Swiss-Prot record:
Gene3D superfamilies: Winged helix-like DNA-binding domain superfamily/Winged helix DNA-binding domain. Residues 68-91 bind DNA. It holds the Pfam family MarR. It is found in: Cytoplasm. PROSITE patterns: HTH_MARR_1 (PS01117), HTH_MARR_2 (PS50995). GO terms for molecular function: DNA binding; DNA-binding transcription factor activity. This is Uncharacterized HTH-type transcriptional regulator YhjH.
Length: 175
């Protein structure tokens, strides 16, 4: 058994999986873009959203009312990124600002009716993708699924560069 050859095959399959994931996201984004165009016609606006922006909108929908800090924590991103995205979503008419009666300083976000519609569509397709993913694993034994879980966890925690490696640039990542 040639382990190096098998590892190379795994790398090629990994690259193909990433490519397929990009195509899958493209299909979902194309559908959501069509729905956005319909919402634009209804509301007289023009908005093109990235998947990250749609995920911020979805985070608001799942947790409203919610502030910038909480969104950033839940999405594992910076407050600056959330602030920039929320400004765009506010301008596009998908979010509105609110303040709680006991704290007039803190700004919270809620979805507008257009935001609720987009959130609902995103949630529906997210659930369908999850069902498809879960049913995919029906063909495997519990032991194989546990190995897949370990592999995915290791990829998430050990494969991608650390913050220190990223700060050092590509030469430090590929040394």
């Amino acid at each position: 058994m040639n382990t190096d050859h098998t590892k190379r095959n795994l790398f090629e399959l990994y690259a193909e999986l990433i490519h397929q994931q990009e195509k899958w996201e493209g299909l979902i984004k194309a559908f959501l873009s069509d729905e956005l165009r319909k919402l634009d016609v209804e509301h007289g606006s023009k908005s093109q959203l990235t998947m990250t922006e749609i995920h911020v909108l979805s985070c608001v929908g799942d947790n409203e009312p919610i502030n910038v800090t909480s969104i950033a924590e839940k999405m594992n991103t910076t407050k600056a990124t959330v602030s920039r995205i929320s400004t765009k979503l506010l301008g596009a008419g998908f979010l509105h600002r609110t303040q709680l009666s006991d704290n007039k300083k803190e700004v919270y976000f809620r979805l507008t009716p257009a935001g609720k519609k987009l959130h609902s569509l995103h949630k529906y397709y997210h659930q369908k993708a999850e069902q498809r993913f879960l049913s995919f694993f029906d063909r495997y034994t519990e032991e194989e699924i546990l190995f897949a879980e370990r592999l995915f966890r290791d990829l998430v925690t050990k494969w991608y560069p650390s913050s220190e490696e990223i700060e050092g640039g590509l030469p430090s990542i590929f040394k």
